C-alpha cells in the first residue's frame, strides 16, 4: 500500500482521511514522521495556509505530502470565522468555546447562511497542486448531535435530510462535506498518476 503524509496532528482529520483513503493509501500524520512542530498558519486565506504547511513539511522533513485548511464562513459575520475558525475564541480555547462565540454573535440574527470550505495542497517534488471543496448550509441556534468535531453540531448542510454534520454517520458526512469533496478531487488526481 502506498504511503502518503498528511500534514496534521489533528486526530479527527486523520481519522476522516483514513476512512476516505484507507483502502488505497496508508495515511501518515506528522507524529508518524517525527514532526512535533507547531507549523505556522499565518496566512489570510485557507489556500495559503494549506500551501504553507505542505511546504514546511517538505522543507524540514523531506516528504512529499498534502495538507489542508478549512474555514467556516458565515454570511452575517462577513465571512467570519473563516481562516481563523480553529482559533476563533482565542488562544487556549477549544471547539466548544468557538461554537459559543459564533452562537453569541448570531443571537437574534435571522440570516444564518454559511459554508464550509476546504483547501488541500499536495506537494510532490516541487509541484504544488490545489484541490477545493465547499458545502453550503445554515448555522443553527443550538447544538444538535455528538459526532464529528469543530462546528459540526451547529452546521446543517443544505444537502441531506436536515441533520447537522454531528448527527450524521461518518459515511453520510464524508459523502457531502467540504473535506469529502476536496479529498475526492485529490484522490482522482492521485489515481490518474498511477
Where are the predicted features?
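Anionic-ligand binding patches
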Residues: 2-5, 11-194
